[in-house]
């Protein structure tokens, strides 16, 4: 497992780590301090994942903008 402040190597690894954190938090077995640390790491991973998704979306838009015949509907995240 990567160090707490280290970014995972890929989006998929970050997502996997985030899922593990959620499972541990949902178990309710963690001491308060450890749960807070896990929650903090989870927030970091979620933000990093969101940033990677936004970068991927921008790349797709750039690639599609090279082809003027292709239109891309605006992206609207479900949570907004």
From Swiss-Prot:
Assigned GO CC terms: cytosol; exodeoxyribonuclease VII complex
Catalytic activity: Exonucleolytic cleavage in either 5'- to 3'- or 3'- to 5'-direction to yield nucleoside 5'-phosphates
Biological processes annotated in GO: DNA catabolic process
Gene Ontology molecular function: exodeoxyribonuclease VII activity
Cellular compartments annotated: Cytoplasm
Keyword set, alphabetical order: Cytoplasm, Exonuclease, Hydrolase, Nuclease
InterPro entries: Exonuc_VII_S, Exonuc_VII_ssu_sf
EC number: 3.1.11.6
Pfam families (UniProt xref): Exonuc_VII_S
Primary location group: cytoplasm
Assembly description: Heterooligomer composed of large and small subunits.
Family per similarity comment: Belongs to the XseB family.
Functional summary from the UniProt entry: Bidirectionally degrades single-stranded DNA into large acid-insoluble oligonucleotides, which are then degraded further into small acid-soluble oligonucleotides.
Protein name (Swiss-Prot/TrEMBL): Exodeoxyribonuclease 7 small subunit
Organism: Shigella sonnei (strain Ss046)
């Amino acid at each position: 497992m990567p160090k707490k402040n280290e970014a995972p190597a890929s989006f998929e690894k970050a997502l996997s780590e985030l899922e593990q954190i959620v499972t541990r938090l949902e178990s309710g077995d963690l001491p308060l301090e450890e749960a807070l640390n896990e929650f903090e790491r989870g927030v970091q991973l979620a933000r990093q994942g969101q940033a990677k998704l936004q970068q991927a979306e921008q790349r797709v838009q750039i690639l599609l903008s090279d082809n003027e015949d292709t239109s891309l509907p605006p992206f609207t995240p479900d949570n907004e």
